[in-house]
From Swiss-Prot:
This is Probable phosphoketolase. It comes from Mycolicibacterium paratuberculosis (strain ATCC BAA-968 / K-10). GO terms for biological process: carbohydrate metabolic process. Its cofactor is thiamine diphosphate. SUPFAM superfamilies: Thiamin diphosphate-binding fold (THDP-binding). Coiled coil: none annotated. It holds the Pfam family XFP_C.
Length: 804
């Protein structure tokens, strides 16, 4: 099939007059229920004239996009019934929430899920009343909506979620409505390229439906105003075959849309049939639909002398004063009665039988499709024993390794054992992040042209790489929401590109947890590497650890942040995260050569606790003895610098009782009243004391540690070092010095904070200042760090040899 192939308006119609009449009535029923949800408190079937008490005092909702969504839904039901198709519906214009609720109700799913809202007049009254009403449901296609995997509040992610749902679902078709406003967003523009990653043999299909109703909130849309030939050329350039449906006469549009959907589904079947018949898999040209209908179609044409239907004025509530303005109320009643509710519902308020017969049944209903409640389909990963990948550690700090390279061997075998339910996403960084061992079990999925020098590209790869963090996260979210597992690996600084996507996913999870009918899904797992302390070669643009702060702002029951200090702890944490459900897990780990501290048994015990005293690095060892100072650390580089500082202190001040505490699970720092992983006060005080100085070396921005610990008894004695936005292209040790996180500055902090040391150890303090100057001078002269610093390792000493 040629990329130049184009189809415009389909000829003919597969609908008989009877079928057309029924589909039109079904559409009218959905529109009626949609308007009722926006406006009505009572009198759902208009058994009496509308009065002020029948109308909501606050009108909230969006009408403009809703009739278009309802139109597509009605016609997809016909496709599902006629072809026994497995279809879910993703609505980019999620503000058309009343439409999706209406259709779930018409199919009977809503009453099955929410048993108090029956299919009768009283059920209709409750359905209408709850919409955008205190104690009710939100205005968008949120998690409360049966059949939804995409809320559509923040625009841009519909298409990428749809493709994520289709991956590894060979018999699923994801119909995805894209609003012409949403089409102006960056993620959506990139999302068109997802077809280059869709394997027609092993994946399902996505049917994009570009809804051109012409307007956003208050402005025209770009794609609706360019010449149609230019629009078609754009879509063909993306690799699609557009089929256009256009008009404002319902009868004509029904006939066009029925023909267009038949043509599109025939095209999908032909593509998949050819690909699955054997032979080389090539990238096909998938069909899509361009749907041009008026915004606010079937609503008021004119309100207060101004055009509404077909304009931006129909975006939200076309009649805004129906509670207090009799003219608006009369116009609302006329609007509602125009749908002929007596033709759609019987006297008891039930959808008439001939219309109910238009909806699919059971799991084929889009509102009841198990793919849209992915936890129903979720199977545990078949995970290898992570202990088999352990880094041998005979004594702490004596072995050098690359933590993410170690993890890559584990992930290789995770992929090998779960080829139908696990994918790894990365924005062209998987090899850079030293995870390339995975290519021993899989390739990178790629259906476009290849060149002889390309490596690891294949149509059926498990790794997905595209230089768009939005696509990586969106694909993974769609994959998870439909019952699968995955991992998103990313440079730490650039994961900020998807900050708002994380926000939206967290909101979805929070709501889903409150809905007993929504089953738990696999956690959204981030692996952040190439992190702030080892981006000395790329400079300030690549140095930002603030994603942790964003995650920490989210609801405690959803978020977990892990900072494993070495490869064995990283393996333990990764295994835990891949087994978890309904969380957002953030793992921050280094990729550069670094010291390994814990053997596997010790790593498992340490990660299980989440934090703990490293006895082998401490000099405060006597039973019952209080330390003079606590050196705490979280993150691989802060751990290195803390241990180096402890090494200096034990040599220079052998009588100083130092306790080293390492933190893997950052949320352990909070009280147990604030986070499920939080430490009770008595346990926190036992580790960090109630009155001794705590010098805390932290991977990210220092203020987060203060936020997490501000209720602790010893907070006034807590002094945190971390990233202070001092960065450039320099050496690794110069980076930590720029931010006062280096070993010499940590020693200075101890001398300044422990009572009596300032004067007694004045010479040591001066030597630390001199050591910092010397280290910086060395970099300026040689262009690298002093080998004595760069090659430092932990050596046993008499005072802590018992545990070594």
């Amino acid at each position: 099939m040629s990329l130049e192939t184009s189809t415009t308006t389909p000829a003919g119609s597969p609908l008989s007059d009877r079928e057309l009449d029924l589909i039109d009535k079904y559409w009218r029923a959905a529109n009626y229920l949609s308007v009722g949800q926006i406006y009505l408190l009572d009198n759902p079937l208009l058994k009496e004239p509308l009065s002020a008490e029948h109308v909501k005092p606050r009108l909230l909702g969006h009408w403009g996009t809703t009739p278009g969504l309802n139109l597509v839904y009605a016609h997809l039901n016909r496709i599902i019934r006629n072809r026994d198709a497995d279809v879910i519906y993703v609505t980019g214009p999620g503000h058309g929430g009343p439409g999706l609720v209406a259709n779930a109700y018409l199919e009977g799913t809503y009453s099955e899920v929410y048993t108090g809202i029956e299919e009768d007049a009283e059920g209709l009254r409750k359905l209408f009343r709850q919409f955008s009403f205190p104690g009710g449901i939100p205005s968008h296609v949120a998690a409360q909506t049966p059949g939804s995997i995409h809320e559509g509040g923040e625009l841009g992610y519909a298409l990428v979620h749809a493709y994520g749902a289709a991956f590894d679902n060979p018999y699923l078709v994801v119909a995805c409505v894209i609003g012409d406003g949403e089409a102006e967003t960056g993620p959506l523009a990139a999302g068109w390229h997802s077809n280059k990653f869709l394997n027609p043999v092993t994946d399902g299909a996505v049917l994009p439906i570009l809804a051109l109703n012409g307007y956003k909130i208050a402005n025209p849309t770009v794609l609706a105003r360019i010449p149609h030939t230019e629009l078609e050329a754009l879509l063909r350039g993306y690799g699609y075959r557009p089929i256009t449906v256009a008009g404002d006469d319902p009868t004509d549009v029904h006939r066009q849309l029925a023909a267009a959907l038949d043509e599109a589904f025939d095209g999908i079947a032909a593509i998949q049939g050819a690909a699955r018949g054997g032979g080389e898999v090539q990238r096909p040209v998938w069909p899509m639909i361009v749907l041009r209908t008026p915004k606010g179609w079937t609503g008021p044409k004119v309100v207060d002398g101004k055009r509404v239907e077909g304009t931006w004025r129909s975006h939200q509530v076309p009649l805004a004063e129906t509670h207090d303005n009799p003219e608006h109320r009369a116009q609302l009643e006329e609007w509602l009665r125009s749908y002929g509710p007596e033709q759609l519902f019987d006297d008891d308020g039930r959808l008439r039988a001939e219309l109910r017969a238009l909806a699919p049944t059971g799991d084929r209903r889009m509102s009841a499709n198990p793919h849209a409640n992915g936890g129903l389909l979720l199977h545990d990963l078949d995970l290898p024993d992570f202990r088999d990948y352990a880094v041998p550690v005979s004594r702490p700090g004596s072995v050098t390794h690359e933590a993410t390279r170690v993890l890559g061997t584990f992930l290789r075998d995770v992929i090998a054992r779960n080829k139908d339910r696990f994918r790894m996403m990365g924005p062209d960084e998987t090899a850079s992040n030293r995870l390339d061992a995975v290519y021993g079990a899989t390739e990178k999925v790629w259906l476009s042209a290849t060149e002889p020098d390309d490596e690891h590209l294949a149509p059926d790869g498990r790794v997905m790489e595209v230089l768009s963090e939005h696509l990586c996260q969106g694909w993974l979210e769609g994959y998870l929401l439909t019952g699968r597992h995955g991992l998103f690996n990313c440079y730490e600084a650039f994961v900020h590109i998807v900050d708002s996507m994380l926000n939206q996913h967290a909101k979805w999870l929070a709501t889903s947890r409150e809905l007993p009918w929504r089953r738990p899904i696999a956690s959204l797992n981030y692996l952040l590497t190439s992190h702030v302390w080892r981006q000395d070669h790329n400079g300030a643009s690549h140095q930002d650890p603030g994603f942790i702060d964003l995650v920490a702002n989210k609801r405690a029951e959803l978020t977990r942040v892990y900072l494993p200090p070495d490869g064995n702890t990283l393996l333990s944490v990764a295994d835990h995260c891949l087994r978890s459900r309904d969380y957002i897990n953030v793992i921050v780990a280094g990729k550069q050569p670094a010291l390994a501290y814990l053997d596997m048994d010790a790593a498992i015990a340490h990660c299980t606790r989440g934090l703990g005293i490293w006895d082998w690095a401490s000099t405060a060892r006597s039973i019952g003895a209080e330390p003079d100072v606590v050196l705490a650390c979280a993150g691989d580089i802060p751990t290195l610098e803390t241990l180096a500082a402890a090494d200096i202190l034990r040599r220079e001040l052998p009588d100083l009782a130092v306790r080293v505490v390492n933190v893997v699970d950052l949320m352990r720092l909070q009280p147990d009243s604030e986070h499920p992983h939080g430490l009770p006060d008595r346990e926190f005080d036992a580790l960090f004391t109630r009155d001794r100085p705590v010098i805390f070396a932290y991977h990210g921005y220092p203020w987060l540690i203060h936020r997490l610990t501000y209720r602790r008894a010893n907070h006034a004695q807590l002094h945190v070092r971390g990233f202070k936005e001092r960065g450039t292209t320099t050496t690794p040790f110069d980076m930590v010095m720029l931010n006062d996180l280096d070993r010499f500055h940590l020693v200075i902090d101890v001398l300044d904070r422990v009572e009596g040391l300032a004067s007694r150890a004045a010479m040591l303090r001066q030597r630390m200042v001199d050591a910092r100057l010397a280290a910086r001078m060395y970099t300026r002269e040689h262009g690298e760090d002093d080998p004595a610093i760069a090659n430092w390792t932990w050596e046993p000493s008499e005072r802590n040899s018992r545990s070594e």
